[in-house]
Amino acid sequence: MTNAMKNHIITNLFRCMAVSALALGAAACSDWTETEAVEQQVQRPADQDSAFWAEYTAALREYKQSEHFLTYARLYNSPTPSASEKDYMRCLPDSLDIVSLTNADNFSRFDAEDMVTMHEKGTRVLYQVDYAARKAEFADAAALKTYLDGVIAAVAANDLDGYSFTADPLDATATASIVATLSAAKTDGQLLVYEGNPLFVAEADRAKLDYVVLDTEATTDITTLKLQVVNATGYAGIAPERLLLAAAAGAPLYDEEVVEHAAITEMAERVVSLGPLAGLAAYDIDNDYYDVERNYPLLSDAIQLLNPSK
């Protein structure tokens, strides 16, 4: 995946937008007395140059299969109503490795369409079970099992790439049930990712997790961050190559000199210096979407910081 490839696609997109703008301008100025509907058709990069798209996505998949620092993001997919394109997977950075859908219960036809593009890019898509936030919805173990059975069926039906989950530290029984059920359902190539403090997962179950996203999204200083990493890799026994650090878009992170940095980019630096660890997990990415020059500037910069030669 080279900058030339990206620039070629971006150039094509701008050309398409310019042609559309000229067409709209001509239609608007041709008759000032009548209002006329103008059809607008979005042309995806794959439709502009299919041969180049195939070459580009093959390079992306090769990159994601190579040894590199991972980038992972949560996405609240397909809300009702949708605010903008930021609500859809197709607008995520191409180099993103894993996306966890936090509204996967409402997986839409737009999500289904985007899955084709995600897999072309080699991006893995997970169904998030946010038990920590939704515990009250499950009256008992039977209700949780029924829900998990539905999750497993949805992952299979929509060709998702596995599961992510959170846990209630005061409900070890539910956590054990989630791990047992989802790890048993996981097929070859699928992932099981836990988001939180690994000490809240039974020691015997930690080996069943492919990755752990450490709950560092609210951490604001490096001293605390270092202690969290030591606890995860030491007391909890999570191998560094399985540990990702979480950071929220828009949040601050203060270094050893109490200098403020954007949490996402500074956390990316710490993935390297405190490990090397597996990678970075970005939360609240809707706060990072809009920018004058490009979408997701912080997340894109973090990906480049972690993998500058890729």
Language-model-detected regions and their locations in the chain:
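Bacterial Sec-dependent N-terminal signal peptides
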Residues: 1-10, 20-66
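Generic hydrophobic, helix-prone segments enriched in Leu/Val/Ile
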Residues: 48-63, 213, 264-270, 299-305
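N-terminal secretory signal peptides and thylakoid transit peptides that target proteins
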Residues: 12-15
